[in-house]
Amino acid sequence: MKLRTYDLVKKYRNRTVVNHVSIEVSQGEIVGLLGPNGAGKTTTFYMTVGLVMPNNGKIFLDEKDITDEPIYKRARKGIGYLAQEESIFRKMSVEDNILSVLEMTGRTRKEQIERLESLISEFGLEKVRRNTGERLSGGERRRAEIARCLAIDPKFIMLDEPFAGVDPIAVQDIQTIVARLKNKNIGILITDHNVYETLSITDRAYLLFEGKVLFQGTAEELAENEVVREKYLGKDFELRRKDFSNV
């Protein structure tokens, strides 16, 4: 299955911030959406998620046009979204946060509890399962949010700045989790200002510049492209790929 955009255009007043952008993500791959501030990457990401409606262009889940569908309908079709801002319910425990989503999936109570226990174990949340959201560290919160996102059994997950506001150890933890999601045949779209952390785990990436796709290709191809280095990465950029084959 593929999630793809075709010829997306977004204008604010007389300014075109996204200018005929087409991207795609397949299940089982990690794709980066990169670019400097003002390049249009966040707007493109939000249109793909369903938070912003395009002026022109289409968004498809396989061959089904989902352009006009709001975010909650896209979630029902298997498109999960993890916001940059804290999205966990601060006054609820970790397990109640996850259960709040499981209760909407049509599972029996027994199936909900079984899935809850599986997610708690998978994301190493046993010690904090009864802690409220406000008591979690940045890394614990991210893990809880990803676990809650998985409660809908998504085919795709959209990650908005997943490495923002977490310490280096938590960054490695999140990268490992993302690699595991890929191994579950989930497609991942990441937009993040942390270029090193993002490119170290992506299979492919799109670089947006002045509202258009300047370059698309593998992380290695992007890192070696002279135009990309000149306009975005810098001439001294060195790609540091990580091996997640054993996760």
Where are these regions (language model features)?
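Conserved ABC ATPase signature
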Residues: T132-L136, E140
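Helix-to-loop junction immediately C-terminal to a conserved catalytic motif
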Residues: V49
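Conserved ABC ATPase "signature" region
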Residues: K110-V128, T176-A179
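ABC ATPase NBD coupling module
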Residues: D65-G80, E85, R109-K110, R129, ...
